[in-house]
């Protein structure tokens, strides 16, 4: 065989090998191997939590880490029965406000998930509960709760003593309606006060509404929730990207540099913090700091500090563990563990752009409606807006019941 022909064959072989290598390195491709071509544990793929586990352990299961099979079956049945009652309800008997509140029903919530084995995602403290708030955090929550209750005190919510008005009293419209909120309104500014989701009972501007209504509710850490949760992990040497598809199209993305470089300067604050990753054996450990003061997780904001551990347990399972710390919010750190199950790359798609803002006519319509209410009251054509609930000021604890009855048996 001539040298020329040998050279041609050699060139073809080299090109073929390069193409195969590039295909193997293509980000996001799944592999049967649990290791990347460059020798790191492979976390890539589309993942979800396919069972329902409460964040905190319900009091009646204190000191028990696992449900029995019988308890799991009974809890599944109770949830299914509650959803069935909601589906059978006649919408004609509702007012407009309750009908809007009921829009978040079984079609939105992931009620099809079966109960998991564990009684809580929290594994430390051993009681499975979020540690107590610090005095500083308790005061902040109390101040915001007091303000929230003042703005709903003239509504039927308090008149009828429905869920959401706990701690409040029915009375005339409060002069505090004209006040600036004591703190930035977030997901939990209401201190757990009803379905306002952190919104206050006013619509002077978008900032009066909760982060969810403003398509800004996505937060870290993200344990999923009732409205669905998927994530996609893509790896490359020195970098890992995570695409979250969660809630009502409120997806988001984060990039984790795998580096020894220090965090950003302390004055640089980001909505999902600043991540720095390193490999510890088979686990990717990610340190996250520098959160924005407008972000929110269970009462914590700019002082939130996370240490995450991502571990591939087998071909179909990732364990996600995160230790959560903020000494201005909780009396001690606490740790959550959650398992994600691998999904088909062919049958699922993660949307890289959040869809919540696209076609979101709800916010401008709500603000326009509030202005019309004010005009009608000024012209003596309608009631005082302070006596109305703006987009539901509470009373729909889980999105299923007009009476505020919670269809989640774990919260009873």
Describe each PLM feature range:
Residues 2-412:
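PEST-like low-complexity, intrinsically disordered acidic/proline/serine-rich tracts
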């Amino acid at each position: 065989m001539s040298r020329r022909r040998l050279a041609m064959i050699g060139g073809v072989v080299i090109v073929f090998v390069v193409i195969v290598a590039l295909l193997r390195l293509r980000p996001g491709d799944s592999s049967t191997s649990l290791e990347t071509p460059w020798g790191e544990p492979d976390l890539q793929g589309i993942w979800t939590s396919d069972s329902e586990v409460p964040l905190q352990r319900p009091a009646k299961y204190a000191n028990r880490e696992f449900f029995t099979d019988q308890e799991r079956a009974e809890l599944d049945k109770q949830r299914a029965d509650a959803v069935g009652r909601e589906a059978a309800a006649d919408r004609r008997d509702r007012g407009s406000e309750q009908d809007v509140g009921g829009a978040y029903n079984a079609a939105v919530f992931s009620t099809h998930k079966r109960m998991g084995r564990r009684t809580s995602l929290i594994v430390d403290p051993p009681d499975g509960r979020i540690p107590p708030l610090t005095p500083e955090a308790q005061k902040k929550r109390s101040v915001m709760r007091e303000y929230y209750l003042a703005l709903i005190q003239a509504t039927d919510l308090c008149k009828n003593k429905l869920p959401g008005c706990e701690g409040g009293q029915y009375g005339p419209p409060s002069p505090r309606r004209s006040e600036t909120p004591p703190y930035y309104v977030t997901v939990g500014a209401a201190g757990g006060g009803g379905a306002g989701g952190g919104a206050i009972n006013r619509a002077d501007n978008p900032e009066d509404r909760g982060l969810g209504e403003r398509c800004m509710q996505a937060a870290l850490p993200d344990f999923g929730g009732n409205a669905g949760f998927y994530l996609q992990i893509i790896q490359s040497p020195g970098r890992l990207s995570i695409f979250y598809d969660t809630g009502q199209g409120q997806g988001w993305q984060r990039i984790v540099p795998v580096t020894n470089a220090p965090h950003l300067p302390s004055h640089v604050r980001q909505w999902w913090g600043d991540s720095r990753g390193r490999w510890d054996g088979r686990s990717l450990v990610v340190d996250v700091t520098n959160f924005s003061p407008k972000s929110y997780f269970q009462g914590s904001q700019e002082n939130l500090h996370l240490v995450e551990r991502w571990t591939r347990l087998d071909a179909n399972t990732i364990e996600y563990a995160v230790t959560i710390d903020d000494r201005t919010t909780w009396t001690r750190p606490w740790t959550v563990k959650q398992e994600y199950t691998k999904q088909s790359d062919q049958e699922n798609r993660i949307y890289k752009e959040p869809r919540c803002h696209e076609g979101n006519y709800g916010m401008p319509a709500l603000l326009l409606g509030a202005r019309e209410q004010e005009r009608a009251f000024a012209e003596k054509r309608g009631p005082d807006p302070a006596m109305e609930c703006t987009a539901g000021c509470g009373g729909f604890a889980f999105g299923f019941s007009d009476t505020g009855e919670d269809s989640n048996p774990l919260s009873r």
